[in-house]
Regions:
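Short, structured coil segments at secondary-structure junctions
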Residues: 52-54, 130, 163, 182-183
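C-terminal functional module detector
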Residues: 1-3, 23-24, 100, 161-166, ...
Length: 263
């Protein structure tokens, strides 16, 4: 198990960002990320400028509609978002899945109309089994934001109903910021590739943090299981690991608020 840092929500001058594609990739390297996803609003035009020699990148898009924003990663063919409506989103998601993509709900409780039309998730998902991940933390301030608290509550409620959906962090990266404390999503992968990261997300093998990387495992009868695995009811030995210098320069114990560690 090797949890590596990624950012799954990025924009460039091909939509409303200030980065060129190259500048975004170089900024990601400077931020000690291992892989990013390029998710410009309603366009693939930046894909041809990606250079995986700078940093590996997942080809993605942010469906930006009047009823919410949906992140689509790794689709092998075009799926038209322009006819997405509140009551046909399940069919649109199935179309994405049919061409190899995964889908995530971006900032589900962001301020919506009339100030940010479409920013809040208003699609009527009937089959949550087809949703791969939810952005439970968005931008900075994390759990201090009510919109993030509500997103976390949504994710937790779906887990309680038996759905297997990954939690992710979304920086929603448009430009280089001079202030703020931003986190990332750690994915459990054996190699850095779009295929491996997407598989980890499908399996729920993600950790989000704005400081140290932390992971946990359970052990029973010589078998070790990690985040995203399913285990049977019983007695297990629990192990917890934290890497205080995993990504953020000079990260230390002061970055960890134990009451906010959620398993």
């Amino acid at each position: 198990m090797s949890y590596l840092p990624c950012e799954l929500h990025c924009h460039t001058i091909h939509s409303d960002g200030d980065f060129t594609v190259s500048e975004l990739q170089k900024a990601a390297v400077d931020d000690h990320l291992a892989i990013i996803a390029l998710t410009d609003h309603n366009t693939f035009s930046g894909w041809d400028e990606l250079d995986d020699n700078i940093i590996p990148a997942i080809r993605g898009i942010e469906w930006t509609t009047y009823f919410g924003h949906m992140l689509v990663l790794g689709a092998n063919d075009f799926v038209d978002w322009r006819d997405a409506q509140p009551d046909n989103i399940d069919e649109k998601i199935k179309q994405v899945k049919a061409v190899g993509g995964i889908v995530g709900i971006a900032h589900p409780y962001q301020l919506g109309s009339p100030l940010c039309t479409g920013g809040r998730w208003e699609f009527n998902v009937r089959d949550w089994r087809n949703v791969d991940y939810i952005e439970v933390w968005h931008q900075n301030l994390y759990s201090a934001k009510r919109e993030n608290e509500r997103a976390l509550e949504l994710w937790t409620s779906l887990l309680d109903k038996g759905y297997k959906i990954a939690a992710t962090y979304g920086r929603d990266w448009h430009r280089e910021e001079t202030s703020g404390h931003y986190g990332c999503t750690y994915v459990d992968v054996d190699d850095i590739s779009a295929k491996s990261v997407m598989r980890a997300i499908r399996l729920g093998k993600t950790v989000i943090s704005h400081g140290a990387k932390f992971i946990f495992r359970v052990h029973r009868h010589g078998v070790t299981s990690g985040i995203g695995d399913t285990v049977k009811k019983g007695n297990y030995t629990f192990s917890f690991f934290t890497d205080l210098h995993s990504r953020v320069k000079d990260a230390g114990m002061e970055d960890i608020v134990y009451k906010e560690i959620k398993i």
